[in-house]
Regions:
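Long, distal/terminal scaffolding or interaction modules
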Residues: 1-238
């Protein structure tokens, strides 16, 4: 890099100074690191590279002969082309489908998915017309996810925002380490639900298994049916 005098720097624009000094700049990414989001952050927040999509522009994708990686790459390609409503056909229990979507999108999955589906999302609305495996919606930041049937264990692990809804029953450790958002279960939930819960709310219309709310820091759990037992640090209230 050639030497630059102080007077030369003063006469340059900001962009010229950055280039002359060999500096680089890059967009900061990701959410705030606060335990709970600023209530207005979701509406204001967007990723600078997120594609602009048209919800009225709709397409279907048959995933029967595709790997999960290929499906996820194709979703991003379709979004870059402006598609705002995407229907995935024949998912056949594939793992890690629709992860890391950081943009507004209407996504409809016609069938069941495997482990870690729709994790790390920030913005999309997802409907799954089937069942889901373990850890659906893990680390979700915003958006909505609706599962028409049942879900496996660790449903909504570590979510920080958004609405995660399962019309059926879910497995154990629902909402483990959740830091915000809302989890709604139409049926029952298994043991250790709300384990190490920090914030947010969980609404279960049915029964809850053993050790509900074990090691909770904060947050609220509503149970419509019976509770098998409470965990350490859980406090019952009416």
């Amino acid at each position: 890099m050639a030497s630059v005098t102080e007077n030369e720097l003063k006469s340059m624009t900001q962009e010229e100074r950055v280039k002359a000094l060999g500096m680089t700049s890059e967009q900061l990414t990701g959410r705030s690191m606060f335990m709970e989001f600023d209530p207005g952050e979701t509406e204001r927040f967007e990723y600078p590279w997120a594609p602009k999509v048209d919800f009225n522009k709709r397409t279907e994708l048959d995933t029967v002969d595709m790997t999960s990686t290929e499906v996820n790459s194709k979703i991003r390609e379709l979004m870059s082309e402006g598609y705002g409503t995407i229907v995935l056909k024949n998912p056949r229990g594939k793992h890690s489908l629709a992860v890391g979507i950081l943009s507004k999108l209407n996504l409809i999955i016609e069938g069941s998915t495997g482990y870690f589906g729709v994790g790390l999302i920030d913005g999309p609305n997802v409907r799954i017309n089937g069942r889901v495996g373990w850890s659906c919606g893990e680390n979700m930041m915003s958006g909505t996810v609706l599962i028409e049937k049942n879900a496996g264990s660790t449903f909504g692990a570590a979510i920080r925002g958004g609405d995660l809804v399962c019309k059926g029953s879910v497995g154990s450790r629902t909402g483990i380490d959740m830091k915000g958002g809302t989890i709604i279960v139409g049926g029952d939930t298994g043991a250790l639900s709300g384990f190490m819960m920090q914030r947010g709310r969980m609404i279960v219309c049915g029964n809850a298994g053993k050790n509900l709310g074990d090691s909770m820091y904060d947050g609220t759990i509503y149970i419509g049916g019976e509770i098998k037992s409470f965990g350490v640090d859980a406090v019952e209230a009416e």
